[in-house]
Amino acid sequence: MNLTNAFNCAQNCLCMLFKNLSRLGLLLGLILFVSCSEDDSMEETNTGGETNATSVYITDSPVDETNVEAVFITVSEVKINGKTIEGFNKTTLEISSLTQGRTELLGELELEAGMTSDITLMLSETDASENGPGNYVVTNGGEKVEIGSASQINVNDQVEIIGDAQNEVVLDFDLRKSLKQDGESYSFVSESQLENSIRAVNSMKTGIVTGNVDNTGEADGDVVVAYAYKKGEFEESETSTNSEGVNFSNAVSSSAVSGSNGEFEIHFLEEGDYELHFASYSDENSDGKLEFSGMVEADTASSIDLSGFTVEANSEVNLQISFTGLLGL
């Protein structure tokens, strides 16, 4: 082989080597690109908001009808932010027994920190044993009366889910606002009223108001109810019934004052400023239905002002109260 041929051969070999190296470089670059893209995709997937364990409970504010022994509802599904409680089975609850801070666990789910977007309760026409009705009142005579209407309740309240915490969402199914009676029949109030009748709170951000009245007889009634309002939101018109037959409809929550010891408890009040009002009721015509008698004048034995006091999270406001009679009499 002469020098020219040898040179040409070497040149060809170098060209082939460079071509192969170029191809290898392109292949390695492609592999690295795909790998980086997959990593980026995984990072994007993993950067979604971290979820927090959240327990969901249900409770009730008392119904103020003397002829009602108990109220049952059947919950078939619970959704928060579109997520259903996993493993939830249709449950029939004696909702009227869940007063004075008593709750029943509906289940648990994982939620991202921040404000909830929607909370939905699904009610069933049949009970947990697939017998009807699923939602009903038991009267003092033992009769079971079906509660008409309502299969889905979209709760208007939003709840803040706190990051890195064991959150407890409490749904306050206020029967006093949720039910209406027409003769011997019972039904849920209208959809819009019902949505505003159920509160949703995170118990981590709530407090309690408790109290003792030393002279309930001064209220001159069969039953006295304590109503908690956001400060400045009580008006005289609250004593009149709305279109659904509900009075004190804008109260945040309420509690009957015990006729035997004068005690009352209002639980799951979100931190903030409140005012407290007392109303007297009597069954004037012995029909089992309480009629509003009047507002009760009340004083406290402490420096706490009933027209404006603060409830803080994880705390209790205790009130020692004396009644001085019905207002306006």
Each model region followed by its residue ranges:
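Hydrophobic helical h-region of N-terminal Sec-dependent signal peptides
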Residues: L26-L30
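Bacterial N-terminal signal peptides that target proteins for export
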Residues: L3-G25
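A short, solvent-exposed, low-complexity linear motif enriched for acidic/polar residues
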Residues: S37-S260, H267-E271, E275-L329
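C-terminal motif of bacterial Sec signal peptides marking the signal peptidase cleavage site
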Residues: L32-S35
